[in-house]
Amino acid sequence: RSESSKHHIMQKLAKKEFNTKSKKGYRGQTIIFTNSRRKTHKIANFLQNKKVNAAAYHAGLSYYKKEKIEKDFDRGKISVVVTTAALAAGVDFPASQVIFDSLVMGNKWISPNEFSQMLGRAGRPSYHDRGIVYLLPEVGHDFDGESEEAKALDLLESDSEDVFIEYDEESSYEQILADISSRSIKTTDEL
């Protein structure tokens, strides 16, 4: 698949999804994951030129720009957010569809846990009845000695990796003090 044909596929999938509505009343919206800030803008601009309301979203944007995109997407004013791993975790967007433009983020393959977090952005139960995930690997594209289509199969067949959490007493105290000073914790029971 050439980059141009991938962009056309993304456009068709995003338009089709935006024309669907969940039983909970939300229109279908799409998150596209790609591997660089530059590509977020390139894909978003392509989609905008094809009459798809898309926005690039990455860590290099100002806080206010990111917040505006988040609010506009949440309100259904934007049908597509094209992002790096910046939206992989912790954001509860009303997306019904996730498209992987690339399985490389930055300069490494995404891990099974990252993949799980990213595909988990599609079909949030409070918004949609189902989630759809598309992988658009480039056949013949190798990275770090492995083809993208082989990596796609590995990720689809993988289980999440174990997570090991190490607690540092000093860091725990710092976090507790930060939570208290920001008033996110109001009672000792919440500690």
Language-model features: locations:
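Short glycine-/polar-rich loops that comprise or flank the Walker A/P-loop
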Residues: 27-28, 50-53, 78, 93-97, ...
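Conserved segment of the helicase C-terminal RecA-like domain
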Residues: 93, 104-153
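C-terminal accessory/connector segments of nucleic-acid motor ATPases
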Residues: 73, 161-191
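Conserved helicase ATPase core of P-loop NTP-dependent helicases/translocases
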Residues: 42, 53-84
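Glycine-rich phosphate-binding "P-loop"
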Residues: 1-8, 47-57
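Conserved nucleotide-binding/hydrolysis micro-motifs of P-loop NTPases
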Residues: 2-3, 36-40, 61-63, 87-89, ...
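Beta-edge loop/turn motif
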Residues: 74-95, 99-102, 120
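Conserved interdomain linker/interface between the two RecA-like ATPase lobes of SF2 helicase motors
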Residues: 1-36, 138-140
